[in-house]
């Protein structure tokens, strides 16, 4: 029995809690009186829109606004449902029913006891979007049984899935629920029940006459009692207990005394409206404008623009039809795209750059949409005025004009080696201008300009024309070997401290001690040249023959006699400078024409690659020679004798190369420590060579230098002066003989044959292994059983019993 009572008690508590919870979940109130609301958004396609709920009137005693309809496009309130005033002065604390129906023409509001109101809407030519709101500031104190379009609000906070429902500060429960009379009974009925109930003496302990008359409690006066709101404004009590006015659209101020439309004189029957405190004129259909001052004409009298406006509308300006373009378009017919919109077209010049359309863009007419032309303007860093960004950002390097033979670039001499290159236009004649200046304190600098105009243009060269500025050339003393790898068939231009020169007037030699410096080698791809001196009457004939440029007859003889592949490098790729402090250099300037031949022979025929260039160039070259090594040739020599001597020296050098292993550093790892010896002025032009040669001839042989380089590599203690020409290097010739080609082909065939034999042997061994494996597996798995084979053989030759007579079978 006790257990049964406990179960009943628990069940009763559960039912009571469930009922209370269901009541709480179905009742809602706004926790924020100033910002709480419930909003639906719908268009005319959702009409008619119906709903309803039960409510408790506002605790402020003011009229309770149950529903507000606002035009979403303009913000104008179209209509409201306000609860009618009851006998208690809007202080009734009981649940009342309310329902509504929204249509395109108006709002119908239904209240209990048959009360109803209707609000008509103004007609609109455009489709409307409605915003339906329940505001906490003027709305009901509590709500329950909310049903919209047959959908009931569920959850806490409430949730409705249709018409974009949103709610702010709307929560479950109601703090005023105890004061509401859910059964609809009034206080008078409660008094009557107490009056009819039996009187017990137990409760009459004190005589009523002794108590006297007690004054009923009175509420303090509302702050809005003395706060008047003009122009139908509504007085509200804030959370701080102060009175404030809620003004209608078109009015503002503390008491709604200011009319925002008072200063807007709408014309031609226009009505002033207000949206968020901003006044505007709502014009009749026949008028338009800010104050409805413009009257519409008939369509037949509408302005016609020729050509037709593509991205705008045709309007009358000063009595003339003109195109009024939309944003982003310009031109006479609005068919020119404004590419300067947003200054994105000039963003590559920085944030301060601005884009400006050309002046004629607003008058340009086009049949199709085109991009407008524009200019990018940037502020000048000095005076701040806007100039063309292209001119402001143009490179400041000095370029050589086609008509100028030479340009002096630099007047300021830095304390470190400088190499500046400026590109010359491709179509201009190629002009190589090298300007050198000196910074020696004891002797004024005399710039020497070397100009090599070329009549033949080679488009394959990467540097069609360039200007090189470098520091003065000075004599140096160092010993190093630089070997250029075969792929780099290039010229070498040395920037840094090099031998310097003096003017043509004789000067006294002066010794200037200069600390050791570092010479940097710059490589520019260019065509090799063969430099020759033209024979002059009564003078010595000198010819500088490139060691790797033999004639066609000599090439054929070398192909027949040579059986090995040789690779010969030009003279400037291998440089050795003797370190002798006693050597005194003399300098001069001489001008002579330079002849360059350019040929290409087929590799497949004689495996010879030769690159030469055919042009005649006047040039100015500076030669250097120690004072102790000066050679002069009295008798002129012929070119054939010199070439034969060169060929013999090449053969001797090849034998030395085959027996000695040459080790050299790559060109990118080569630096030459140089020193500055005495400077000697030489007034008389003469050719000076640092390498001693026989007196009968003056030659430059690459093979001799290479053999000396090998001896220098083997023994670093022995220092031998080497030939160093400041002129451009000769070409590089690769000789590949036919015997080497045949030997490499035979070796390739032998290797291929051996590979095929090995592959065939592997395939044969694999096949034998597979066959052996199959045979062994058949024996192991019973497929090859000798007993079974014997039984099958005997059964095949045995006579069946059907062919034997019955008597024989019985026997």
Swiss-Prot record:
InterPro entries with a match to the protein in the record: EGF-like_Ca-bd_dom (IPR001881), EGF-like_dom (IPR000742), Fol_N (IPR003645), Notch_Cell-Fate_Det (IPR051022)
Cleavable signal peptide: 1-20
Composition skew (Acidic residues), residue ranges: 551-567, 597-612, 640-655, 705-717
Residue ranges with Polar residues bias: 570-579
Bilayer topology term: Single-pass type I membrane protein
Domain EGF-like, residue spans: 220-257, 258-293, 301-335
Glycosylation, residue list: 90, 171, 232, 371
KW Zinc (keyword) present: no
Record region (Disordered): 544-579, 592-659, 690-739
Transmembrane segments: 750-770
Record topology, Extracellular segments: 21-749
Disulfide bond annotation, renumbered to this chain: 224-235, 229-245, 247-256, 261-272, 266-281, 283-292, 305-314, 309-323, 325-334
GO cellular component, as recorded: axon; cell surface; membrane
SUPFAM superfamilies from the UniProt entry: EGF/Laminin (SSF57196)
Cytoplasmic side stretches: 771-811
Localization: Membrane
GO molecular function per UniProt: calcium ion binding
Keywords: Disulfide bond, EGF-like domain, Glycoprotein, Membrane, Repeat, Signal, Transmembrane, Transmembrane helix
Pfam families tied to this protein: EGF
Major place of residence: membrane
Protein name: Abnormal pharyngeal pumping eat-20
């Amino acid at each position: 029995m006790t257990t049964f009572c406990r179960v009943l008690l628990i069940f009763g508590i559960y039912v009571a809690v469930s009922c209370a919870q269901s009541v709480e979940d179905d009742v809602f109130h706004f926790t924020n009186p100033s910002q709480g609301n419930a909003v639906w958004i719908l268009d005319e396609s959702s009409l008619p829109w119906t709903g309803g709920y039960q409510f408790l009137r506002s605790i402020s005693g003011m009229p309770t606004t149950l529903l507000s309809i606002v035009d979403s496009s303009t913000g104008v309130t179209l209509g409201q449902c306000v609860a009618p005033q009851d006998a208690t002065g809007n202080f009734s604390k009981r649940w009342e029913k309310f329902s509504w129906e929204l249509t395109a023409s108006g709002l119908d509001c239904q209240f209990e006891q048959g009360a109803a109101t209707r609000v008509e809407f103004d007609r609109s030519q455009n489709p409307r979007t409605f915003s339906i709101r329940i505001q906490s500031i003027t709305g009901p104190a509590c709500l329950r049984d909310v049903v919209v379009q047959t959908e009931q609000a569920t959850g806490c906070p409430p949730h409705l899935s249709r018409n974009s429902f949103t709610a702010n500060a709307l929560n479950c429960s109601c703090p005023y629920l105890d004061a509401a009379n859910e059964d609809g009974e009034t206080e008078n009925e409660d008094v009557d029940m107490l009056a009819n109930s039996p009187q017990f003496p137990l409760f009459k302990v004190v005589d009523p006459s002794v108590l006297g008359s007690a004054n009923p409690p009175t509420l303090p006066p509302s702050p809005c009692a003395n706060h008047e709101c003009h122009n139908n404004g509504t007085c509200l009590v804030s959370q701080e207990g102060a009175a404030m006015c809620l003004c209608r659209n078109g009015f503002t101020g503390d008491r709604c005394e200011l009319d925002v439309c008072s200063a807007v004189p709408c014309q031609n029957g226009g009505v002033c409206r207000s949206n968020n405190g901003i006044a505007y004129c709502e014009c009749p259909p026949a008028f338009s404008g800010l104050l409805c001052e413009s009257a519409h004409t008939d369509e037949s009298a509408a302005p016609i623009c020729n050509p037709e406006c593509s991205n705008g509308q045709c309007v009358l300006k000063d009595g003339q039809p003109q195109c009024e373009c939309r944003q982003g378009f310009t031109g006479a017919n609005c068919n020119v795209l404004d590419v300067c919109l947003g200054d994105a077209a000039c963003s590559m010049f920085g944030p301060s750059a601005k884009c400006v359309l050309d002046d004629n863009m607003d008058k340009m007419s086009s049949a199709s949409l085109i991009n407008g032309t524009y200019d990018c303007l940037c502020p000048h860093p000095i005076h701040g005025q806007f100039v063309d960004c292209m001119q402001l950002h143009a490179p400041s390097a000095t370029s050589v004009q086609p008509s100028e033979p030479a340009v002096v670039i630099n007047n300021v001499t830095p304390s470190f080696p400088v190499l500046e290159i400026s590109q010359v236009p491709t179509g201009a004649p190629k002009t190589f201008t090298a300007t050198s200046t000196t910074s020696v304190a004891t002797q004024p600098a005399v710039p020497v300009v070397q100009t090599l105009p070329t009549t033949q243009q080679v488009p394959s060269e990467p540097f069609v024309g360039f200007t090189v500025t470098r520091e003065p050339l000075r004599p140096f003393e160092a010993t190093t070997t630089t070997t250029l790898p075969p792929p780099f068939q290039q010229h070498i231009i040395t920037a840094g401290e090099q031998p310097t020169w003096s003017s043509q007037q004789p000067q006294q030699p002066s010794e200037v001690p200069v600390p050791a410096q570092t010479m940097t080698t710059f490589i520019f791809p260019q065509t090799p040249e063969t430099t020759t001196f033209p024979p002059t009457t009564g003078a010595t004939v000198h010819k500088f023959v490139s060691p790797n440029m033999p004639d066609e007859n000599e090439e054929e003889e070398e192909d027949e006699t040579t059986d090995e592949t040789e690779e010969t490098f030009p003279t400037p790729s291998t440089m050795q400078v003797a370190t002798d402090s006693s050597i005194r250099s003399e300098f001069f300037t001489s001008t002579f024409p330079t002849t360059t031949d350019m040929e290409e022979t087929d590799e497949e025929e004689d495996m010879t690659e030769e690159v030469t260039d055919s042009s005649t160039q006047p040039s100015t070259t500076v030669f250097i020679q120690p004072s102790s090594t000066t050679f002069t040739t009295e008798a002129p020599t012929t070119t054939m004798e010199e070439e034969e001597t060169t060929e013999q020296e090449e053969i001797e050098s090849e034998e030395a190369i085959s027996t000695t292993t040459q080790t050299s550093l790559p060109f990118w790892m080569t630096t030459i420590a140089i020193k500055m010896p005495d400077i000697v002025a030489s007034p008389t032009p003469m050719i000076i060579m640092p390498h001693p040669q026989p007196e009968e001839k003056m030659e430059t042989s690459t093979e001799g230098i290479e053999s000396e380089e090998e001896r220098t590599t083997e023994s670093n203690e022995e220092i031998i002066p080497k030939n160093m020409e400041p002129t451009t290097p000769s070409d590089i010739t690769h000789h590949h003989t036919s015997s080497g080609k045949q030997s490499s082909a035979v070796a390739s065939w032998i290797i291929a044959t051996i590979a095929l034999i090995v592959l065939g042997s592997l395939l044969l061994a694999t096949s034998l292994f597979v066959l052996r494996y199959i045979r062994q597996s058949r024996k192991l798995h019973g497929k090859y059983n000798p007993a079974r084979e014997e039984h099958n053989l005997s059964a095949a030759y045995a006579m069946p019993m059907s062919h034997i007579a019955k008597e024989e079978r019985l026997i």
